[in-house]
Structure formats: C-alpha cells, structure tokens
Amino acid sequence: MTHPPAAPASAGPGAFVLGVDSGGSGLRVALGRVGLTGPLSTTVCAEPVRTGPGGIDAGHLLDQLLPAARELLERAAASDDAATGTATTGTATTGEIAALAIGAAGMATLGERLRAELPGALADALGVRRVALAADAVTAYAGAVGQRPGAVVAGGTGMIALGTDLKEWHRADGWGHLLGDSGGGAWIGRAGLDAAMRAHDGRRGGSAALLDRLRAVFGPAEELPGLLYPRSDRPAVLASFAPEVAACAGADPVAAGILRQAAGHIAEAAAAVCPPPAGTAGPGGEGSKGDGAAPSDESGEGGEVALTGGLFRMGEPLVAPVREELARLLPGARVTAATGDPLTGALRIARALAAGDLRLPRHPTMLFVPSEHGPGEHGGTAVRGEPRTG
C-alpha cells in the first residue's frame, strides 16, 4: 500500500476538495473548492457500503467512490469550459484534489479496514495526500456548527449527542436501540406502540388514539408481534411509528407525555456533552466536565446546541419540549438548527484540512488524519463516554 508523501501546509483556493457521507442509504459525494462555500456538484450511489466480519468493506467503498469522484471532476471540467468558452481534450486531473474527508456510519467501531487501506488507495487512485476519516457523528457535528465549540444532537432512528471544546470529544448515547438511543425515533415509536398495546389490553397507561393509529398503520394489534419480531430492521419499523405519536400529541396526553420524556432524554444527552462557556468552570473545576453533570453557567451564557437529523422534522410537538428541557438543564444555551448535514460537514472538514486549518480534535476512531501520523500510528485525544482505542 502506498503512503502519500507529505503535503504542503495548505492548498490554494482553487484546489478541489471531496466530501463523502457513507450511511445506511448509500454513498453521497460532493466536490467543492477550497476557497468556495458549498459544493460545486454532488452525486449519489444508492447501494450502502457492505459491512462484514472485518468491518466496513474498504474495497466496496472504493468501487463506488472512485467512479463518483471522476464523474464530479469531469463535470467540473465541463463547467469550467462552458464558463471560459474553451474546450479541453481532457478532464480535471485527479491530482488537483487537495483533500478528501469521509464520514461513515460505524467508523468508530467498524472502520479499522478503512483506516488501514483507504489512505494509500486514495493516494494511488486520486493523488490525494490529505485524507480525514471521521465517524458520521463528527461529520454531523461539522455540518451543524462547523468548527466552533458546542454540542450537536443527531436524531433519527437512533440518537447521539456529541460535543467538543476543541480539545477533546464528549459523547453521550448512540448505543443502539437495545442499550440506549433514548429519545430517538425507535424509542418514541416503541413507547407509542407500548401505549397502544396497553389500550388494547385495558392496562393503565394506554392510549386509544395511538391504538387507532397502530391499526391504521400495521393492522390488527394482536398481529403486530408476528409482523415485528421476524424483521431484521426492527429499529426502523419502530421509528416509523414516531410520526404517529407526534401527530396525536396535540390532543392525546399519553402521546404528549411520550414526547416530553423523549425531550428529557435528548436534553440530558446534550447537557452531558456541552462544553461550559468560555471563562466558566464545570462541576469538576477548571472548565472540566466533572462527573458528567451539566456544566455550571455562572456567566449566564450557555453554549450552542444544534439539533440535526430527521427526528426533528416532527416539528414543534418534539422540538418545543426539547427547548424547554434544554433551558432547564443548560440555562442560557443557544438552541439552533443545523446549518448543514453530514455531507456538508465532510466537505467542511476537507476544506479545513486542505487549508491547514482543521481545528476539530483528532481521535484514532472519531477523526483520524493519517498524514499527521506515520503508517500504523493512531494518535489523538480520548472521547469521554467511549473507551480509548488505537
């Protein structure tokens, strides 16, 4: 495997950068320039990257990424020709890619092959010498708030909170629907179905409104176990009922209570990872996170908490109680909508890497930059909430 030679400290504003978002719905790739905001063009590969006993399949990712990258470079060359009124016999060369950042679901736990194989393969195929390999939570963070200190709650089928003071990462939840993801889509959907089944049985805590929605979506309540338990995508099936809970919340106190509980879990995760404001100390003193409690806020100014992901498209039935719970746990916190998605975040990381201005904390599994280490070296800071690896 080729290891890329040392790259110059920074690339010029016209150099290309690539951002990649690999998730359950496939691979998304964006081409941009160092000196421009936003992508020049994007493309989608609908097939998810395979995961096997050895982790995420690096070869399968490359089989999709390399043609996509060349397609985007060809588009850029054609666009440049149209803008200048000239014609070229070739395309933009792969050597013009100054940096590439990949954010992948499962990178932290299943990304060893990617970290071992991709840097050399990308150097050989695309001539790129600056590569960042990130967990999808990190690209979600970069997409939501950029390189500022703060916290991001990424909610979808699951739920994870990630925060940083630009020195280390802090993680809360994201442990899957059996061990956590409290307040996420699957959690809300399961709680809603539980309330529906309670109404079906005549037990306390039931909701007739949610039982009606269960029947409309899945059919007879007594047949639901046979539909749900054989499925390999049970979290997604549970999460599909979460919008029904939100739709009932305005008139049904049980549904509203489920969303308020979810909001409490979401706010607790955000409070666990949100760095204290500059000049203040958390409960451990000296600005530390102490034992995980919410940081003190003696200045009256809280940190930034961004909400991102499809979960929050349920709107005010969920977002309003989340704001209320955050105001209680993090007084003065600024709750914001994400300014971009994980693909935006991957492109932002690539731009910062190309410009020599990547300020987000390095970590061997969360944000690994191989050009900053020798072959086989995994350096970086620890993630609170996750054992250090590498």
Task: Map each language-model feature to its residues.
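A short glycine/serine-rich beta->alpha loop
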Residues: 51-53, 107, 174-182, 332-337
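A general secondary-structure junction signal
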Residues: 104, 135-137, 309, 339
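Glycine-rich beta-strand-to-loop/alpha-helix junction loops that act as flexible
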Residues: 101-107, 155-157, 302-314
